[in-house]
UniProtKB/Swiss-Prot annotation:
It comes from Oryctolagus cuniculus. May function as calcium sensor and modulator, contributing to cellular calcium signaling. May function by interacting with other proteins, such as TPR-containing proteins, and indirectly play a role in many physiological processes such as the reorganization of the actin cytoskeleton and in cell motility. Binds 2 calcium ions. Calcium binding is cooperative. GO terms for cellular component: cytoplasmic side of plasma membrane; cytosol; extracellular space; nuclear envelope; perinuclear region of cytoplasm. Its main location: nucleus. One of its GO terms (molecular function) is S100 protein binding. The modification Phosphoserine is found at residue 46. The modification N6-succinyllysine is found at residue 47. It comes from the Eukaryota. It is a peripheral membrane protein. This is Protein S100-A6. Ca(2+) 1 binds at residues 28, 33.
């Protein structure tokens, strides 16, 4: 039986692949796919304006290929986890 951490990692991977490849490369997120993922999977997503999502995409897209690959996605989740951790500390 998978541990809770194994399950969490599987969920993060599954969510990436749920949205990647709806258009174009199935191993990356386009701007449209990233926007949909953020809006549907993150509580803060519905509060973000389009311009904020575009800025986030630009920040995440380290290699500037106009798509977010899995490594860039995981980097985003790591940064988000750090923000959540700080918020929980007080």
């Amino acid at each position: 039986m998978a541990s809770p951490l194994d399950q969490a990692i599987g969920l993060l991977i599954g969510i990436f692949h749920k949205y990647s490849g709806k258009e174009g490369d199935k191993h990356t997120l386009s701007k449209k796919e990233l926007k949909e993922l953020i809006q549907k999977e993150l509580t803060i997503g519905s509060k973000l304006q389009d311009a904020e999502i575009v800025k986030l995409m630009d920040d995440l897209d380290r290699n500037k290929d106009q798509e977010v690959n899995f490594q860039e996605y995981i980097t985003f989740l790591g940064a988000l986890a750090m923000i959540y951790n700080e918020a929980l500390k007080g």
